[in-house]
């Protein structure tokens, strides 16, 4: 073709002699000439013209001629070129032409056209081209499937026809073959083994096959012998199946007629050739019995046999190679195989015809490359297989061995460049070995490096270059209005101050219920509530006075000691404190039940003895101070901090007159005249019966005798067990382990409410509300739980829980829980526990315990202890007398008898097991059970 542009019309005119009116090629010669022109075509126009001519050609002969001449290969070249140049129109035209050509499997195997088309169907960018390629691929797949299935079937049919002809023509040869079979009996044994394998799958049919083969083999053998004369006889000798079968038939030859009768009905179904076989079969009467049964059952199990044949395929395959080896030499072995095939046909009669599969199976294996050779090899193997096979229209599986030259098959796979590949996937063993070596090396290096790694810097630190960043164009929050709103809000709102880490707010008021809670002996710090047990007792009874008992019975000392040791809070003194405690107790009191505690208390040197024995062990903290009371501050053991360490009492004489006589209750010198007594009571006189409670101190200060106390000259009660607070007070004077937690100040919002630790707020805004210990605030509200206190500053209220106190300055109220108190200044009110009374000070009034709380910043929470007696103010406002002892004034105050779980008659409760066994109880005064002689009368 010229290098200039091509006019398709001129090209068609030049080809007019080869084309008809529709553009179709007229003859086979014309297509060969057109093919020669196509090879010279270089322009796309000419190529498209030739492709359109092929599309118009309908004659399959002409198209096949084009393929044979080399047109298919030429189209492959064009397809490859157009694919590389991505010429979509030309690709579409080529694909249409390929779809139009009658290609076969052999053609597709010649080159990689099919692979190129498949790649186009997957990776082409043009959707139409992809669809066209996928359609072409599906068409070719259908061709491959159809040819692979149809070709073997056609070959089988041809073989069957040939076998039938050979069977019908030579009936006499079987006798000669029988002789040959008698010569070689060993071969028949081998054959029998084959049927046995078949029997494994279908025993009844196996019998039928064996019988049918034996009878039919002679007829079949002669037929094939006619075709293959002497060679056939030799090969038949190799196949002694008929010999054995005939020998077997000879033994039962007497019963031949019945066998014939039985076989005739079977023969009626087969063709005339099968009838001939039936006549030959009669010599097998003995086997016929089982054979007839097999035949009768055969038609029904025929379908089942198909399944069984599938199973048999492996077993049958094993014998087939055996025969194949024997008969592989000449293709004439086919006659032997066809002869046995007729017996198999008899079996086929029972089992609706299964195609002779020996040939088909090899074709399946060889369809790709060994079709002609496979046919030859198949007949060789078929002799054994056909006998075992049935004609049911199904392929028979078998094993064949192709010739030496055809043993190798090559399959070519082209990599689709666009296909995604797993890069990490190991492709071959060599790569896997390399990877393993690298991984081992890496693991070894890391292990070695880690073993000697001292975590030291090996590379000197180099300060990185500072990055110069441009200033931000927009300042964050520059236009925010919310920040101004927040600033205005903060101007009018107090800052939230969290003085205690545990809780930022005041604790909620805890309502006290008369129901005693359950004892859960956890850590000593948080084992008990403020008012764990409440009991109502008679006020009289020296031994039964609850508070007096709680503070005057000896076992409370033991309770203090044991409490300081319990729950992992041993004394801070020597390690052997526990043993010393036991020795001290035994030396002092012997048995708690042997001597009444009051007798011990009356001993003049009893308190000194206790002090001398306890202080060296650190059980009472440091030695006595000015007034003989050890401070309960942080220096002492945690469990002993029930004496506030705050400043001295602001008012002279709240705890005893400065010049008054001091009875043996005090363990040291009298308190200094002003503020020298920062504690309510000393260790031997913790809460009830100090000079301020029961001491006869005649000084100007008021005194208050403890409930149930004896009087100023009576021996002091032992100290009660300390409360172990869980939280420290808020104001400066509070103990770290006060129990009361944070509290609001009476005056300025700061509150000190330790459970038992002392604390005196000297400042104006601190309230002191210790649970048991005293404290005095200069300008503060003092709310000790049990002990008295006095407030000097204005606006301070003294609200001891149980003990008395006097508010000296104006505006102070005295609200003892059960003890009396007088408001000395204006606005001071005395609100004792229960009974009415008149306050000597102005606007002071008595308010019973159980009434509503006192108004103001802090309400008074009643103790809920029943049995409180009212107060009578007979003497001066600051003089209150207990119900038993004489008072300075003319008035007596009768304290309540139900202790704050430090007294109380528990005799109606079960006796404490620990107390009876050990002589002490870790919960001494807080124990819910009866301690004889401590929280109730001693046992009789």
UniProtKB/Swiss-Prot annotation:
One of its GO terms (molecular function) is DNA binding. The modification Phosphoserine is found at residues 313, 382, 398, 545, 591. Residues 644-655, 714-723 have a biased composition (Pro residues). A motif (PP1-binding motif) lies at residues 394-423. Phosphorylated on Ser-398 by PKA within the region necessary for interaction with PPP1CA. Residues 357-433 are annotated as: Necessary for interaction with PPP1CA. Residues 147-211, 247-270, 304-400, 533-905 are annotated as: Disordered. The modification Phosphothreonine is found at residue 256. The keyword Transport does not apply. There is a cross-link at residues 179, 262 (Glycyl lysine isopeptide (Lys-Gly) (interchain with G-Cter in SUMO2)). The keyword Phosphoprotein applies. Gene3D superfamilies: Conserved domain common to transcription factors TFIIS, elongin A, CRSP70 (1.20.930.10). One of its GO terms (cellular component) is chromatin. The modification Omega-N-methylarginine is found at residues 665, 693, 739. InterPro entries: TFIIS/CRSP70_N_sub, TFIIS/LEDGF_dom_sf, TFIIS_N, Znf_CCCH, Znf_CCCH_sf. Residues 73-147 form the TFIIS N-terminal domain. It comes from the Eukaryota. Keywords: Chromosome, DNA-binding, Isopeptide bond, Metal-binding, Methylation, Nucleus, Phosphoprotein, RNA-binding, Ubl conjugation, Zinc, Zinc-finger. Residues 418-619 are annotated as: Interaction with WDR82. PROSITE patterns: TFIIS_N, ZF_C3H1. The TFIIS N-terminal domain specifically recognizes disordered sequences in protein substrates that are then dephosphorylated by PPP1CA (or PPP1CB or PPP1CC). Component of the PNUTS-PP1 complex (also named PTW/PP1 complex), composed of PPP1R10/PNUTS, TOX4, WDR82, and PPP1CA (or PPP1CB or PPP1CC). Substrate-recognition component of the PNUTS-PP1 protein phosphatase complex, a protein phosphatase 1 (PP1) complex that promotes RNA polymerase II transcription pause-release, allowing transcription elongation. Promoter-proximal pausing by RNA polymerase II is a transcription halt following transcription initiation but prior to elongation, which acts as a checkpoint to control that transcripts are favorably configured for transcriptional elongation. This is Serine/threonine-protein phosphatase 1 regulatory subunit 10. It comes from Macaca mulatta. The gene is PPP1R10.
């Amino acid at each position: 073709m010229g290098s200039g542009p091509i006019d398709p019309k001129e090209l068609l005119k030049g080809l007019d002699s080869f084309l008809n009116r529709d553009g179709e090629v007229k003859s086979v010669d014309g297509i060969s000439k057109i093919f020669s022109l196509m090879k010279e075509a270089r322009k796309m126009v000419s190529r498209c013209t030739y492709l359109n001519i092929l599309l118009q050609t309908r004659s399959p002969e002409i198209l096949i001629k084009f393929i044979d001449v080399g047109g298919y290969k030429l189209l492959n070249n064009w397809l490859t070129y157009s694919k590389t140049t991505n010429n979509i129109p030309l690709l579409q035209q080529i694909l249409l032409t390929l779809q139009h050509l009658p290609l076969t499997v052999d053609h597709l195997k010649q080159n990689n056209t099919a692979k190129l088309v498949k790649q186009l169907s997957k990776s082409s960018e043009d959707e139409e081209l992809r669809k066209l390629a996928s359609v072409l691929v599906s068409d070719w797949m259908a061709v491959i499937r159809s040819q692979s299935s149809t070709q073997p079937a056609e070959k089988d049919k041809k073989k069957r026809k040939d076998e039938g002809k050979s069977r019908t023509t030579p009936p006499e040869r079987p006798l000669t073959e029988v002789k040959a079979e008698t010569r070689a009996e060993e071969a028949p044994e081998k054959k029998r083994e084959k049927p046995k394998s078949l029997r494994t799958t279908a025993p009844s049919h196996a019998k039928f096959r064996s019988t049918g083969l034996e009878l039919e083999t002679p007829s079949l053998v002669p037929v094939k012998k006619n075709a293959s004369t002497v060679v056939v006889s030799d090969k038949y000798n190799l196949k002694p199946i008929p010999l054995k079968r005939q020998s077997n038939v000879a033994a039962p030859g007497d019963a031949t007629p019945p066998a014939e009768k039985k076989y005739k009905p079977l023969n009626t179904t087969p063709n005339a050739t099968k009838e001939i076989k039936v006549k030959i079969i009669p010599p097998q009467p003995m086997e016929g019995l089982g054979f007839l049964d097999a035949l009768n059952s055969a038609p029904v199990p025929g379908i089942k046999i198909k399944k069984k044949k599938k199973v048999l395929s492996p077993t049958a395959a094993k014998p087939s190679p055996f025969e194949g080896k024997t008969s592989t030499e000449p293709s004439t072995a086919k006659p032997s195989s066809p002869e046995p095939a007729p017996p198999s046909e008899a079996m086929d009669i029972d089992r609706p015809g299964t195609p002779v599969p020996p040939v088909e199976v090899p074709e399946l294996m060889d369809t790709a490359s060994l079709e002609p050779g496979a046919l030859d090899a198949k007949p060789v193997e078929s002799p054994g297989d056909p006998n075992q096979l049935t004609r049911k229209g199904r392929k028979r599986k078998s094993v064949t061995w192709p010739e030496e030259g055809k043993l190798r098959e090559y399959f070519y796979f082209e990599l689709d460049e666009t296909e995604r590949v797993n890069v990490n996937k190991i492709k071959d063993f060599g790569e896997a070995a390399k990877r393993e070596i690298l991984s081992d090396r890496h693991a070894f290096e890391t292990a070695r490096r880690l073993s000697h790694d001292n975590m030291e810097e090996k590379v000197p630190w180099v300060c990185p270059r500072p990055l110069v960043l441009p200033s931000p164009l927009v300042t964050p929050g520059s236009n925010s209005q919310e920040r101004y709103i927040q600033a205005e809000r903060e101007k009018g709102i107090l800052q939230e101050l969290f003085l205690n880490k545990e809780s930022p707010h005041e604790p909620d008021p805890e309502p006290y219920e008369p129901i005693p809670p359950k004892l859960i002996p956890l850590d000593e710090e948080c084992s008990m509530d403020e008012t764990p047990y409440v009991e109502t007792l008679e006020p009289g009874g020296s031994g039964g006075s609850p508070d007096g008992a709680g503070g005057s019975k000896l076992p409370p000392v033991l309770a203090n000691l044991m409490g300081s040791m319990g729950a992992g809070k041993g004394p801070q003194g020597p390690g052997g404190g526990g043993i010393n405690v036991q020795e001290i107790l035994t030396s002092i009191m012997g048995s708690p039940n042997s001597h009444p505690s009051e007798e011990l208390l009356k001993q003049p040197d009893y308190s000194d003895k206790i002090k001398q024995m306890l202080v060296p062990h650190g059980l009472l903290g440091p030695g006595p101070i000015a007034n003989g009371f050890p401070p309960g501050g942080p220096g002492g053991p945690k469990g002993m901090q029930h004496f506030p360490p705050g400043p001295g009492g602001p008012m002279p004489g709240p705890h005893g007159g400065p010049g008054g006589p001091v009875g043996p209750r005090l363990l040291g010198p009298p308190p200094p005249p002003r503020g020298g007594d920062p504690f309510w009571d000393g260790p031997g006189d913790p809460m009830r019966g100090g000079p301020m409670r029961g001491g006869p101190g005649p000084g100007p200060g008021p005194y208050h005798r403890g409930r149930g106390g004896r009087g100023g000259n009576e021996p002091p009660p032992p100290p009660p067990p300390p409360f172990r607070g869980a939280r420290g007070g808020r104001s400066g004077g509070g103990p770290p382990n006060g129990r009361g937690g944070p509290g609001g100040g009476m005056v300025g919002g700061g509150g000190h409410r330790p459970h038992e630790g002392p604390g005196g707020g000297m400042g104006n805004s601190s309230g002191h509300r210790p649970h048991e210990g005293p404290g005095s605030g200069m300008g503060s509200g003092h709310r000790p739980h049990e002990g008295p206190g006095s407030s000097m500053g204005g606006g301070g209220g003294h609200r001891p829980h149980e003990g008395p106190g006097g508010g000296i300055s104006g505006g102070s109220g005295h609200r003892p829980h059960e003890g009396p108190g007088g408001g000395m200044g204006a606005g001071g009110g005395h609100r004792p526990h229960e009974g009415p009374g008149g306050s000597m000070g102005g606007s002071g009034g008595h308010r019973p315990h159980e009434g509503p709380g006192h108004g103001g910043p802090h309400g008074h929470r009643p103790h809920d202890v029943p049995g409180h007696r009212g107060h009578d103010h007979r003497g001066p406002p600051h003089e209150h007398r207990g119900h038993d002892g004489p008072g300075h004034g003319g008035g007596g105050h009768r304290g309540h008898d139900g202790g704050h779980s430090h007294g109380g008659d528990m005799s109606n409760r079960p006796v404490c097991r620990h107390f009876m066994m050990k002589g002490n109880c870790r919960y001494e005064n807080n124990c819910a059970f009866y301690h004889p002689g401590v929280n109730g009368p001693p046992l009789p």
